[in-house]
């Protein structure tokens, strides 16, 4: 929810909070290591009024962080939120370069993640090589979704693979498509 346009004072506070968040990140990371918790800290950010600090982390398993929460509350003296994020959110937060050589879509312009299925790769006649159709997050490439409808529409105009067509007065079998 956007309440208003940020003014100079808000921007100054935001920049101060970013510096504060970097220090808080390091402190939290150290406390996690000391506590031997199976979680990987990804990011830390403060609300504009610094009344709450949000720590984002990944973990393969459920983590009991009650003791961690107590330790963090005693250090930071504000509300603490521990937010577990998935692989796509992690990639969005950290950023990086995709297989295509461009900045990650999720980090540069995607607002929400749409469902992507292996059928989209099949529909686009891509080789089902998981390494080639997976993003840096380990999930199917988000861009498979962008072109899916276009491939569905254009494939309607072509004969199906395995069907027979007439070409230059000859019966020919369709063995492949290159869309």
Model-derived segments and their meaning:
Residues 178-179:
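Basic/aromatic-rich interaction segments and small domains that mediate binding to polyanionic partners
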Residues 1-121, 125-127:
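Acidic-enriched and Gly/Ser
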Residues 96, 100-167, 172-175:
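Conserved glycine-centered short motifs in functionally critical loops
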């Amino acid at each position: 929810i956007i309440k208003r346009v940020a003014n100079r004072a808000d921007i100054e506070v935001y920049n101060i909070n970013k510096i504060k968040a970097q220090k808080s990140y390091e402190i939290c990371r150290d406390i996690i290591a000391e506590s031997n918790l199976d979680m990987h800290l990804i990011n830390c950010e403060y609300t504009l009024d610094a009344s709450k600090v949000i720590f984002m982390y990944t973990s393969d398993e459920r983590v009991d962080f009650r003791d961690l929460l107590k330790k963090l509350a005693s250090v930071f003296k504000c509300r603490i939120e521990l937010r577990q994020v998935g692989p796509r959110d992690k990639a969005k937060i950290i950023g990086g370069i995709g297989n295509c050589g461009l900045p990650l879509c999720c980090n540069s312009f995607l607002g929400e993640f749409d469902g992507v299925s292996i059928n989209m790769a099949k529909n686009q006649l891509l080789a089902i090589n998981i390494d080639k159709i997976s993003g840096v997050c380990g999930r199917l490439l988000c861009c498979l979704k962008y072109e899916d409808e276009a491939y569905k529409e254009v494939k309607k105009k072509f004969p199906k693979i395995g069907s027979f067509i007439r070409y230059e007065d000859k019966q020919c079998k369709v063995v492949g498509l290159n869309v």
